[in-house]
């Protein structure tokens, strides 16, 4: 009887310990084509972008989410201050045009104030998308320095992942993100990459 009672307590304690483990309750915040952020109306309006992000994070907190997956590199450009890649046209209206704030730094600060982890989402290979053209790439885009790292499929351009130079460059992009920003994870997503 004593043994059964102690076993029952042990099992109950184990169940409670599983119940208290945090769940990943997240949402994705897409920036390509201004799907979620910033809105098309807020392109280049940085105070409006900040207000919109704060409103989103407040809503996520009310929904009891504990993480966001924020797309910071949709088309080989950056929604953060980068020395490797140009500012995103989805943020500023023109690729390479500098924003007056660092959206990723802002998101990290505001999300963490609300107990929300920040996972960054990058599309490692896509260079053009959403109707973008190679001619529209900023002068400081790596394409202009190393066109041999890229390939065209249909109307879209991509990094050529079979090249060591491409992989080395992408590793630098990731290293830059993890060393300069207070982020919890990186998600690499390229379901857009062409395949036969």
Segment roles from a protein language model:
Residues 20-78, 167:
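N-terminal structural segment of carbohydrate-active enzymes
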Residues 21-26, 65-76, 103-151, 185-190:
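Glycine-rich, aromatic-flanked loop segments that form ligand/cofactor-binding clefts
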Residues 63-99:
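Aromatic-lined carbohydrate-binding/catalytic grooves of carbohydrate-active enzymes
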